[in-house]
Amino acid sequence: GLGDVYKRQDFKDNVLKKLNTTNLFSVTYRKDKFAISDKEYPIGYTSFLVMDTDSRFIDESIFEDLKNFTEELLNKDFNRTDFLNYRAKIISVIDVLSQYEIFKIFDIKKCKEIINEFFTEEKIKLYEEYERFTKNEYRIKISEKLDELVKASVDLETAFLIGFFISSAVKEVKYYSSVVFQITNKIVKNNARTKAELAEAFSNFINDPYMNFIFDVNSHPFGTRATIIPVVESENGTSKIYRKVYYNNLKDFLMTDLFEGYIHGHYLWRCDICDRYFFMTTARNQLYCSTCLLYTSPKPTRH
């Protein structure tokens, strides 16, 4: 019967296949800026965001719990209670992420809306019907009903993907934050100011044995899986070609942003007075963050 085609194993395989191929978000690169969710930022700005609300020490346990629950759910019979639990877990994880500046650029609130739409009572009933259908307990006489169930199964696949993506995103951000922290300290220590000095500090950093150890553990962090397409936009009546990049994971976007930032001479510096990190795009000789600059005429003192 029709039910035989849509076995649960196929559903699981689809989810796992989509994990590696789904484009999560797109970024448009324009000269020395990038745009994401219709907002523009200077290239390299993600490095500032992960240090601004220090993302190195996000507690991973809640994310680990979500990942385990998502895997369990994928391997057992679907039921309403589990779906409601799953929704609650994702929502609480999104609430934690919303406190970190880096996640605000991804319109994480929208993710919450999507999850709530995926787990309305009506949708949950359809998922349960789909479950009975895959076990051949549920015969379908009308093709419209089949279409409805297949559509519901695609929504459910997406709901699973969100669980997996969100639980791995936090690992990628923590990892990136520690890379940014190490490299920024190296640059400040080397007093790198010009693009050439930056390149030297960067080279030292990449060849550092500690960094090599990090790079060998988990997949090589500089391997980017992204799809690039040209987009034409009009600026003051003139057409310009920019590149739009679709990323299927967070790490590739973050690493790309960090490196492109250095290429453009955009980078973080630690204030000589208050030790806070600030982001530079033009101020080659600026040693103090803008707050401390107000106090530094004529001679800087710690405050």
Annotate each PLM feature.
Residues 2-3, 268, 286:
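A generic alpha-helix preference that emphasizes hydrophobic side chains
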Residues 284-294:
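Cysteine-rich micro-motifs
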